[in-house]
């Protein structure tokens, strides 16, 4: 194996990049001396170039660009695209020895040497790792956690600490945003459950200026803000937390990948973006057509209680 080429999905959102991180980590774990080249359509080079496991980033816009990115001497090609025939054809023309891709009842299914069936009911980050496991078995959950532990390592002693991390963002629009007012009500209920000394950290991005102003105006000593913090620092924050509660947004996938006790709040069931595990829970409106803010703080509190009880039981048992 001389070089590993990874075609990431043609999606510019932060969450789409974060769910690819454990895949890149695992590839570098297997082949530490080999170059990893990430190829993408979108302008996401700054994200991937900052990673310790990526040696080169190539932005491609045409079929020719993609084809040139896969050299004849490339030993491994991993396609994280779910349905494009383009990447099967590129692999057919270049024929790297190891060709990994998703099966989805297309003719390109025949081209992969190792594959995993695409299923929209499976968390996308888990699916990426199961694709790799078709080549060599490993524990996807352990690999994901180790990935974010590796990113977090420089920040583990200095990152902000909180019992509960709350992520009220939602870059896709208001329909994905359970309101800040609801998060504050939930925080008050969680204090009754966890104790008056419970500390909360709100993770905010550029789009949450209104939420930032509102939180600062509250002057609550139990509330802190992490604004526009880098992914390695947020990884350390999530790994320290007793609980993470989040809307369906990019940073939520740091918490899910880090295997933190997690409650996700969704406007509708969205299993492709929620990693279903015993220490995680998804909350959706009883009638999705009524909108995300019909979810009450008590609805979310019930999910938090279940996740916390399971996590405490596992911690005690271990």
Named regions from a protein language model:
Residues 1-318:
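Catalytic machinery of carbohydrate-active enzymes
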